């Protein structure tokens, strides 16, 4: 999809509503959004109501690419950092401090990519 944000890459590690909704708006404006989901089921919103792709999940994650990576795994964390290195925006809505404990907080990711816009929604 083309739009004013064509050429902008977003890494979305959000779940449920707020993070995915913010990333969805950017995708609607043309950004390439890569949704990072945990192994073992991904975004909990997937299974609401009608199985793997419930209507809420489809609505909030339309136009996104998806990849399964575990932020607790060193190798997968390196892959997340590589995504961030090549991206413009990082959106997360985890509990405060959760990604910092895993080495994926704003300070660390801005060291990987100094021009990164880091959006933390709580």
Can you annotate each of these PLM segments?
Residues 1-122:
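N-terminal helix-loop segment corresponding to the beta1-alpha1 unit
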């Amino acid at each position: 999809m083309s739009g004013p944000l064509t050429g902008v890459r977003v890494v979305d590690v959000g779940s449920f509503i707020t993070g995915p909704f913010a990333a969805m708006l950017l995708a609607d404006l043309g950004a390439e959004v890569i949704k990072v989901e945990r192994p073992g089921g991904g975004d909990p919103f997937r299974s609401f109501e009608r199985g793997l792709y419930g209507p809420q999940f489809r609505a909030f994650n339309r136009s996104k690419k998806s990849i399964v990576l575990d932020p607790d795994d060193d190798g997968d964390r390196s892959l997340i950092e590589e995504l961030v290195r090549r991206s413009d925006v990082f959106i997360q809505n985890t509990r405060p401090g959760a990604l910092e404990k895993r080495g994926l907080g704003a300070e660390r990711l801005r060291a990987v990519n100094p021009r990164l816009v880091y959006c933390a929604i709580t």
